[in-house]
Amino acid sequence: MPHFFKLVSFLYQQYLYAKQNPVLKKLKVGEQEDVYLSAATHDTRFNTNIKGHIGNLNEMSWGFIGTGPYTLALNILYTFTGDAQFARTHAFEFRSEFLEKIDSKKSYWMPNWMISNWIIQKIEGEEIYE
């Protein structure tokens, strides 16, 4: 299948997932909305409302140490800040604190205020939970 048709197919699938489940509509860079992780959606390209802006994979997951949770952490931070360097610097730590320990078989909401506070405290160089 030519690349153009693969891209159209991918965008159409993304549209269908978002139409069937509006909370999975991909956030744009700078949109600081709640992050939704859907265990009911088995296609790891569409199981969250976070778009794969940076990194080598579109597949995003949670509940273990690996590239799926790293890619999700990287793109959550990039979506919220628009700063690729910040996202790369802090993605492992974010993954460790928020994504590794949760059950991959369950869906989750990550409130935007929790993510925003974590980012602010990293920028200011403070500990999050004192």
PLM regions and their residue ranges:
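Amphipathic alpha-helical packing elements
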Residues: E31-A91
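Residues that form generic nucleotide/phosphate-binding pockets
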Residues: N75, T79, E97, K101, ...
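General structural signal for secondary-structure boundaries
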Residues: L7-V8, S38-K51, K106-S116, Q121
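Short, compact, well-ordered microdomains
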Residues: R88-W118
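Glycine-rich short-loop/terminal segments
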Residues: L7-T48
